[in-house]
């Protein structure tokens, strides 16, 4: 049976990795985003998910069988996050309804399903770790829940199957991405080396000492494709991480070693990147000009607010992947190597020296 993919948010960390895998596996792929880039063997579509008319125009004549929603829009409050991001999912699925071609829809959310939204991140009564998919929703407004509800409603209405994927912090390469820890840390390390500044962990003592995990964008892509093509996995949510665990006190030294730095001891007080990097844009521009880098605007590369939110959590964050493992998903990625692979790509693309 013919299978055609529509990847929504294909220019982001998650969407670009998925698009690459689908093309590699021989799928016809259409990539939809507001500003689609050129990717080999991919048909680009430009549309605004917040504009139903824009979607109707862009999707006219399209016949995707599998839809992968890998994007979201950050707003000033959780109320606005809910309003905007739920509408984006609803608008997309409403626009696709007349095609009658959609057999499966995938939605990527994340661990805020268990931790709560940015407005109430890691606060209140949280489920015990490791997080499992059968743990219920928190009693708090959360745009992930609103997105899921739009997906479930459309699936019941239109008869397609679905999956929800909940990664931890995702590592990958995408310039201008809203949540990009690996690139943020690469830029931070480069600035520290250039200025001779200590390479200081920006997060909480709990994160420094506790076990945790992460998600390589390639690992997430593999799980999305596996679930979308495995009937036993249909109509289910899955956690997805690399398959290993680590402590940041170890990972910080591994990252420092990659950049030829010495990892500083844990600081006497919390040292968020938004504070540490507040005045670094001119330094980065100088580094970029000296080394012939492609992006002199530091703010196009880094997302310190997101890295601070992840590394500043006052609780342990570990994820259970038994559910997908029992159904046959066995992919694995060492988390330190996932960082190194991103750093290597950034160097190859002349984004860091």
Predicted regions and their residues:
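N-terminal Rossmann NAD(P)H-binding glycine-rich loop of SDR-like oxidoreductase domains
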Residues: 3-27
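Conserved glycine-rich Rossmann-like NAD(P)H-binding loop of the short-chain dehydrogenase/reductase
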Residues: 27-36
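NAD(P)H-binding glycine-rich loop region in Rossmannoid oxidoreductase-like domains
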Residues: 37-39, 43-91
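Conserved Rossmann-fold NAD(P)-dependent oxidoreductase catalytic core, especially the SDR/UDP-sugar
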Residues: 87-143
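Active-site Tyr-X1-5-Lys
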Residues: 134-168, 173
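Glycine/proline-rich active-site loop of Rossmann-fold NAD(P)-dependent oxidoreductases
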Residues: 158, 172-188, 218, 227-238, ...
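A conserved pocket-lining segment of Rossmann-fold NAD(P)-dependent short-chain dehydrogenase/reductase
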Residues: 187-215
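Mid/C-terminal beta-alpha module of Rossmann-like enzyme folds, strongest
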Residues: 220-308, 320-322, 326, 343, ...
């Amino acid at each position: 049976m013919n299978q055609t993919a529509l990847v929504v948010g294909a220019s982001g960390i998650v969407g670009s990795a998925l698009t690459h895998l689908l093309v590699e596996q021989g799928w016809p792929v259409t990539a939809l985003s507001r500003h689609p880039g050129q990717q080999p063997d991919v048909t680009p579509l430009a549309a605004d998910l917040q504009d139903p008319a824009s979607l109707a125009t862009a999707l006219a004549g399209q016949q995707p069988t599998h839809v992968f929603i890998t994007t979201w829009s950050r707003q000033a409050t959780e109320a606005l996050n809910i309003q905007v991001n739920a509408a984006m999912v609803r608008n997309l699925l409403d626009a696709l309804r007349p095609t009658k071609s959609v057999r499966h829809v995938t939605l990527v959310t994340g661990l805020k399903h268990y931790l709560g939204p940015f407005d109430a991140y890691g606060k209140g009564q949280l489920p015990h770790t490791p997080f499992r998919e059968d743990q219920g929703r928190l009693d708090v407004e959360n745009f992930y829940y609103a997105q899921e509800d739009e997906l479930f409603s459309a699936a019941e209405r239109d008869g397609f199957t679905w999956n929800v994927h909940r990664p931890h912090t995702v590592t990958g390469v995408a310039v201008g991405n809203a949540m990009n820890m690996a690139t943020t840390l690469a830029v931070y390390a480069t600035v520290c080396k250039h200025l001779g500044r200590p390479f200081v962990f920006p997060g909480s003592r709990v994160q420094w000492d506790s076990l945790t995990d992460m998600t390589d964008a390639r690992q997430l892509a593999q799980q999305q494709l596996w679930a979308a093509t495995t009937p036993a996995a249909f109509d289910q949510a899955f956690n997805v991480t690399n398959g290993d665990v680590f402590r940041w006190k170890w990972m910080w030294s591994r990252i420092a070693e990659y950049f030829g730095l010495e990892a500083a001891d844990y600081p006497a007080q919390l040292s968020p990147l938004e504070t540490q990097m507040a005045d670094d844009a001119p330094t980065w521009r100088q580094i970029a000009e000296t080394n012939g880098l492609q992006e002199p605007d530091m703010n196009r590369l880094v997302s310190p607010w997101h890295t601070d939110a992840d590394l500043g959590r006052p609780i342990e964050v570990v994820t259970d992947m038994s559910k997908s493992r029992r159904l046959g998903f066995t992919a694995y990625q060492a988390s330190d190597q996932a960082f190194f692979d991103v750093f290597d790509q950034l160097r190859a693309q002349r984004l860091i020296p």
